[in-house]
């Protein structure tokens, strides 16, 4: 196995979970940005949320254009951090189904590993209810693909995944989280324009489609934009309180220095 383990930063993990919980009916996807060290450990520092051109319940696809754009973003982060950043993996959600990758997922992963043997895949299974406690659960796994013995098919190999705690939310992950509502809105707009451009639709159907479009946007504002804004406001208030505490501590230390002098 090319990769020994994967370490994902806590704020990048938070973006993945938030993205996975944003859509219950279809799968969502994104790309992981990070680096691979000499011990074959993958370190994921940030993620890029991808826009879906085609919403499907059971699969997702990454276009070459999206992969190219992610590579450019990785180069930008490499220039900022001075570290060898690159696209090291992909993630997608499994709403209401098992966390284990499907045969399509395993084949897709094998295709990516042909370009980079260190490429990894992450899956987040969400909207799953525990039968005993009746509470929701989020399961996640990391995997790679290997060729099965005496077969042309590929099989999954689980890769240990460790979430590295992070006390703060770095700017690059904060930007990804803020980008989520805009991407979801763009997906709805694309779907509406694609349907609205059909010439054979009558007036009643167009009005109905417009109502559905408005309803979906309002649902996104209620489920995604509103909570995200509240979370950002809470973080801002926490930062302000912390700044006041540090300022008070600074003034106290300066006063003690004057006393000693």
Curated annotation (Swiss-Prot):
Residue span of motif JAMM motif: 92-105
GO cellular component: BRCA1-A complex; BRISC complex; cytoplasm; nucleus; spindle pole
Binding site for Zn(2+): 92, 94, 105
Alphabetized UniProt keyword annotations: Cell cycle, Cell division, Chromatin regulator, Cytoplasm, Cytoskeleton, DNA damage, DNA repair, Hydrolase, Metal-binding, Metalloprotease, Mitosis, Nucleus, Protease, Ubl conjugation pathway, Zinc
Keyword Nucleotidyltransferase: no
Gene3D superfamilies according to UniProt: Cytidine Deaminase, domain 2 (3.40.140.10)
Cofactor: Zn(2+)
Domain MPN: 6-149
Gene Ontology terms, MF aspect: cysteine-type deubiquitinase activity; metal ion binding; metal-dependent deubiquitinase activity; metallopeptidase activity; polyubiquitin modification-dependent protein binding
GO BP, sorted A to Z: cell division; DNA repair-dependent chromatin remodeling; double-strand break repair; mitotic G2 DNA damage checkpoint signaling; positive regulation of DNA repair; positive regulation of NLRP3 inflammasome complex assembly; protein K63-linked deubiquitination; proteolysis
InterPro entries: BRCC36_C, JAMM/MPN+_dom, JAMM_MPN+_peptidase_M67A, MPN, MPN_BRCC36
Cellular compartment(s): Nucleus; Cytoplasm; Cytoplasm, Cytoskeleton, Spindle pole
Enzyme Commission code: 3.4.19.-
Location (main, coarse): nucleus
Keyword set includes Zinc: yes
Cofactor: binding details: Binds 1 zinc ion per subunit.
Subunit structure: Component of the BRCA1-A complex, at least composed of brca1, bard1, uimc1/rap80, abraxas1, brcc3/brcc36, babam2 and babam1/nba1. In the BRCA1-A complex, interacts directly with ABRAXAS1 and babam2. Component of the BRISC complex, at least composed of ABRAXAS2, brcc3/brcc36, babam2 and babam1/nba1. Within the complex, interacts directly with abraxas2. Both the BRCA1-A complex and the BRISC complex bind polyubiquitin.
Alphabetical list of PANTHER family matching this protein: EUKARYOTIC TRANSLATION INITIATION FACTOR 3 -RELATED
Role, per record: Metalloprotease that specifically cleaves 'Lys-63'-linked polyubiquitin chains. Does not have activity toward 'Lys-48'-linked polyubiquitin chains. Component of the BRCA1-A complex, a complex that specifically recognizes 'Lys-63'-linked ubiquitinated histones H2A and H2AX at DNA lesions sites, leading to target the brca1-bard1 heterodimer to sites of DNA damage at double-strand breaks (DSBs). In the BRCA1-A complex, it specifically removes 'Lys-63'-linked ubiquitin on histones H2A and H2AX, antagonizing the rnf8-dependent ubiquitination at double-strand breaks (DSBs).
Similarity comment text for this entry: Belongs to the peptidase M67A family. BRCC36 subfamily.
Name of the featured protein: Lys-63-specific deubiquitinase BRCC36
The organism of origin for this protein: Xenopus laevis
Origin organism lineage: Eukaryota, Metazoa, Chordata, Craniata, Vertebrata
